[in-house]
Amino acid sequence: MIYQSPTIQVELLEDNIAKLCFNAPGSVNKFDRETLASLDAALDSIKQNSNIKALVLTSSKDTFIVGADITEFLGLFAQDDAVLLSWVEQANAVFNKLEDLPFPTASAIKGFALGGGCETILATDFRIADTTAKIGLPETKLGIIPGFGGTVRLPRVIGADNALEWISTGNDQRAEDALKVGAVDAVVAPEALEAAAIQMLKDAVAEKLDWQARRNRKLSALTLPKLEAMMSFTTAKGMVFAVAGKHYPAPMAAVSVIEQASTKGRAEALQIEHQAFIKLAKTDVAKALIGIFLNDQLVKGKAKKAGKLAKEVKNAAVLGAGIMGGGIAYQSASKGTPIVMKDIAQPALDLGLNEAAKLLSAQVARGRSTPEKMAKVLNNITPSLDYAALKHSDVVVEAVVEHPKIKAQVLAEVEGYVSEDAIIASNTSTISINLLAKSMKKPERFCGMHFFNPVHKMPLVEVIRGEHSSEETIASVVAYASKMGKTPIVVNDCPGFFVNRVLFPYFAGFNGLLAEGGDFAAIDKVMEKQFGWPMGPAYLLDVVGLDTGHHAQAVMAEGFPDRMGKSGTDAIDVMFENKRLGQKNGKGFYVYSVDSRGKPKKDVDPTSYGLLKDAFGELKTFEADDIIARTMIPMIIETVRCLEEGIVASPAEADMGLVYGLGFPPFRGGVFRYLDTMGVANFVALADKYAHLGGLYQVTDAMRTKATNNGSYYQA
């Protein structure tokens, strides 16, 4: 053994080829400080051994290296620029040391080689991948750029155009696609991986392969003619900005760094990367996006833990077919859990099956599935008009019409047909789980399971704990949601649960603006373009449905009369009473037609403006800051109330609920990250300016205390 540490082992194989194996104690390899220090020490040991003629990098795991240890980032990025620069330079010295070894090097890549893992393989002369390999630099998705030489080496390996696409999108690439652009030199079967890498090194040692010429290309400036370079980078800037937009600076910074470094050798090029990396690491966007990544890990960790308490779900059922039932059935079956779809009407079952088939056909058309897989998934969906089909179901999801009496009746009925230990969950967006539980003989085996529409696209599922729900029930439904490929957050029962409870104060703020003559299209534009929502409030209400919004608003007003009670007609009422229900009937705030691709296309409609003018008078212009404050303050305060009341367990889960359930702008990180970035004291001062607008604008006592103490919701 040439070198050994808890994360890396180096041994000498036949023909004096050294093998460096990444072998961290956990399930995956990642570059934390310890692994980086071990790699540095291992390379020193390798350099000192005069017998070594070549080096192969391998992994003992199913993956190569998944990237840097992101849990270290926020603390590290909070350091002074000089400290951060020192860390980046020390880390890069390790990768330079690998690249500068006096003999040929190769990486044997399986599974993920992402971020720092990808930058490791770029520092070797040859790269062999097996068919499971996925390679990429996802840093721009975290608001930063590669910091271990990725922007320098990748363009010199695969060309500037390809590198610009890889780095600016942050997407990982399959082995076959990496081979096409020259990121890897060969793709082999998993069992042949190490042998193929060693054979390539033997050929390099025997001078059949010119490893030094390859290395020199990475150390030199890019060989791009001036005119071609100018055209390439100008085109890239336009394309990248069109996708990334003004709120996500990292992709554009990556283009700029690659352009500036294109005429430099390695040392100068790395300095350009270092400076841009440090600048981006200090941004609020990086803090927000890294925070989302860490929050996602926390939520998934909780779900994994729940799996240990959970009853295994081998068979499921959904009550109520149609679009929602079909979506739930598709999601369950496509992730491997057979499901019975029960309804009282054959046309509803046909609609549900058609919905599942339509979603599967789209997967096949996009090349993400095959007709064989589609048939297998459809065979996992069993339509039935009879409750008897549910007798083997471990979990039954009730998804009938959103009416308390009908739901209660169906829940009471189904309890008589399922097994003693079956779990029943209600897919409801507003109806109290405690209320529905009153109709059940075993309320401990009942909870809420709120899917968001469309089911196949929306990642969030709210699992609602009723006062009688057992821990096993909650754990089992959380585990089932995870198995379906969803991100579950557990919330306690209250009107609207978590997501709808915080959404409707936002709509109330919007209604307030319209009642004073606000222009809904202008408000949408501000909330989309400036704040960053995927849809403004008027457009979102049209998509949700004004009938659904009208009903949910009434539920919220009844549940929280002090803050959400209504004294008169608002804009939602106006649209609903005039049968303008949104996209579902082609007219709401906007009017809808179908474009050439069959998608709804919205246009401003003078009729809706006329109705609002009749109700609220002439249009009035509001400043953008005023629009943002009046819509967002109620949502933010209500979110804080949910945390204080224990409806949601942590700031992390609340923020993930907002990002995944409502499309809260990821670059802002969620309400609690937004509050911390703004400063709680600054927010309280802003809210106080609008306190005269009513209860939704009144901050809590705990918020005032936190503001006075200069506190934050996340620990630095």
From Swiss-Prot:
Pathway membership, UniProt: Lipid metabolism; fatty acid beta-oxidation
EC number from the UniProt entry: 4.2.1.17, 5.1.2.3, 5.3.3.8, 1.1.1.35
Entry binding sites for NAD(+): M324, D343, V400, V401, E402, K407, S429, N453
Family matches, as Gene3D superfamilies: 1.10.1040.50, 2-enoyl-CoA Hydratase, Chain A, domain 1, NAD(P)-binding Rossmann-like Domain
Region (Enoyl-CoA hydratase/isomerase): 1-189
Site (Important for catalytic activity): E119, E139
Residues the record lists as binding substrate: D296, N500, Y660
InterPro entries xref list: 3-OHacyl-CoA_DH_CS (IPR006180), 3-OHacyl-CoA_DH_NAD-bd (IPR006176), 3HC_DH_C (IPR006108), 6-PGluconate_DH-like_C_sf (IPR008927), ClpP/crotonase-like_dom_sf (IPR029045), Enoyl-CoA_hydra/iso (IPR001753), FA_oxidation_alpha_subunit (IPR050136), FadB (IPR012799)
PROSITE patterns recorded: 3HCDH
Pfam families: 3HCDH, 3HCDH_N, ECH_1
CDD domains: crotonase-like
GO biological process: fatty acid beta-oxidation
Keyword Aminoacyl-tRNA synthetase: no
Record note on quaternary structure: Heterotetramer of two alpha chains (FadB) and two beta chains (FadA).
Known function: Involved in the aerobic and anaerobic degradation of long-chain fatty acids via beta-oxidation cycle. Catalyzes the formation of 3-oxoacyl-CoA from enoyl-CoA via L-3-hydroxyacyl-CoA. It can also use D-3-hydroxyacyl-CoA and cis-3-enoyl-CoA as substrate.
Protein name per Swiss-Prot or TrEMBL: Fatty acid oxidation complex subunit alpha
Native source organism of the sequence: Shewanella sp. (strain W3-18-1)
Species classification: Bacteria, Pseudomonadati, Pseudomonadota, Gammaproteobacteria, Alteromonadales
Gene expressing this chain: fadB
